[in-house]
């Protein structure tokens, strides 16, 4: 239910219209999204993170199985060990360009990590680098080398940015594991990821494109 802004003085009308537009956007998203659920059992020996997560993804009508599963991979690789400094959440980038695919906000709404998937342009990544403590991007298309060559030199000032490449064959194999309800096991060791469901398993080795600091 929307708050009543009708008697709050000057500017109340604009405030109400803003609240109404936000409500409509959220309502439209809820109507069009397809809900996917994953019970994710994570064993990350590289980060010493061992946890079970019940993940709910509101999938945009235009999102492919491949992209959705890359978001799940990104969640597994970045979810913090605890919630003392906030949570990593799936965001609404396909509905709202001002949001990433996932983000980790602390309890003051500070963006601790911004995660994009796909091939964002350099301007988007630089804006994200100015808003968040850390920015991570995962590209999974066969055209990744071309995309990266075009923007690499434009990102040198973004010291808090890390870009990863997922080989197209690996992301396509991962897409075949997608189901509306999944029980997903993820093991991370020495930079390699093993993801398994009832439909099969996939080995993934993300390759870092940005230079190590």
Features from the language model and the residues they span:
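Conserved catalytic cores of phosphodiester-cleaving nucleases, focusing on short active-site segments
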Residues: 102-104, 109-125
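N-terminal amphipathic/basic-hydrophobic helices that include classical n-h-c signal peptides
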Residues: 1-28
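Mixed-charge (Asp/Glu-Lys/Arg
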Residues: 30-47, 185, 194-210
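Acidic-basic catalytic patches of nuclease active cores, encompassing PD-(D/E)XK
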Residues: 46-94
